[in-house]
Amino acid sequence: MTDNQKNIIGTILLNMSASTIPVTEEMISNLVDINDSMNARMYGTPQMTPEERQEVINALHAALFVRIDRGHYVKENNHTPWYMAAKAENSSKFWDRYRLYLLKEKHWNGDTINELDKTTDEIMDLLGNPDQADGFMRRGLCIGDVQSGKTSTYIGLINKAADAHYRVIILLTGTIEKLRRQTQQRMDEGFIGLDSYALTLKKGHVQVGVGAIDPTTSGWAVTSTSSDFNAATAQKVVGQLSKISAPVIFVLKKNKSVLEKLEHWLRLYNIDPVTQKIDLPMLLIDDEADNASVNTKADDVTAINKGIRKLLVLFGRANYVGFTATPYANVFIDPDSEEEMLKHDLFPRDFIYALEAPDNYIGARNIFGEDAPYGYMLESSDDCEYALPMVHKKEDSLQFIPESLKEALAAFFITNAVRDLRGDQKAHRTMMINISRFIAVQNQITKVVDSFVRDWKREIRNYYLTGSEALQYDSFSFIKKVYDKYFKQFASNPNFARLKHFTWEQIQEVLYPAISRIEVRAINGGNAPKNLDYERYEKAPDDIGLRLIAVGGLSLSRGLTLEGLCTS
């Protein structure tokens, strides 16, 4: 998407965020044309092509017709509300620039941001008051659907915590370094406002994300997109926390050594020798809170759980807030050990907040639930059992490509062609294959799938411009069959009326350019930072996104974001 397109989308969303007039198709179309003409007149930018204009209209549709309702929560009764009174007195500079960032850069609509505003207000009010003199230890849990916006919620919460005078923020990601780096990058863009890599190396202030909106406000990064916590770096960048006026954030893996190093550094340089506490209010957010954080042994505190607790007790005023889509381990902690009875573990004793998903979210209940609106997509298939049984050993291998996997590959090919036809060439597209937890089996599957994809690519390259004659070849006839079975019906489906649909002939004409860049990679054994290198493709001269078939197991199961995930 060009800068002109982004500016038009951002301007329209910003103006409409304060409007109460109902949005219509005609209004969107007129506003796009007015802004396009104005930019051409005032700044000399070329007017949009019909394809670019349609891309802008599609983006505005996606933003303006989505809303999120507020969530629901349960809490203990002794907590005193404090946040709304504090909010009226405090500056809201961190939240204000995050709000503008969501509007102008992420193209959220005003209603959705307003609901996020209300939701984060409610969660803030469930935390302790950072300005109170008395100490506190609050523990809570936020529950949301998979990939439904939990990250945006806790980034919003962190911005509001900074406005409310929280001085130390610790954000725990999963156990994988790639996930930590992804989360750090989002914090750079959504809260810190600076490139943390340049900041920790003292190479100057490079504005990113919210920093481009208001460079006068920033969080202080101790970790970066290149490095987890390091005591030497922390001492060089921060020194003593009490001497830093900006809120300081640590983005950490859930790793025993990392947690111990941070605890040791905090204790050595920041603790009050009299109270044996750090007298700064702290918010600890535990993303994927059911992963590695919960105690799994009766009277033996597990390493990660112990590390988190040791961080919490360092601070006189502290909050622990877990975020998860699978809360069972957290909610059903059995306080049957002496340790849990004495220290309460990380059980969310103070509140549980259930986040609502956006109304355009399609999750498990929309497909598998009773009377599910998308249940018609379900098909029963067990052909993979003959190729690689669900219960298998690390010595086993994928014997052949089952029909269902071939259909999934064909669907991914078609999806790439459709997105190119819609003008989304710059968008990343990913397909996930997760059918074994054994690395040896995953690597073998990668080779088999890669060989199959290369054969299809070769045939498509040779014949995609031969019209209907191409259908005599296996790859074309199979992909056309998948198009007829799964894609053709959407043209007449009212749920997809706003989308632009394409005939098989149109898809075939662009099929090879769309799929020629597809790569098959194994994601395992710590190679995710190298193999999920979306950032490198964003900086490439042709600005074409990564098109990837990711084969993996446990590494793909825990929080890693697969950009543009189309097919699983």
Annotated model-derived regions:
Residues 1-93, 97:
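N-terminal accessory nucleic-acid engagement/regulatory domains that precede
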Residues 136-154:
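Walker A/P-loop
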Residues 151-165:
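Walker A/P-loop NTP-binding motif
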Residues 167-206, 437:
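Conserved Walker A/P-loop ATP-binding site and its immediately adjacent core
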Residues 196-229, 275-289, 424-549:
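Conserved C-terminal RecA-like helicase domain
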Residues 198-210, 280-286, 295-419, 430, ...:
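Conserved P-loop NTPase catalytic core
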Residues 220-280, 293-311, 552-553:
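Conserved RecA-like ASCE ATPase "motif II neighborhood" in helicase/translocase motors
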Residues 550-551, 560-568:
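A short beta-strand element within the Helicase C-terminal
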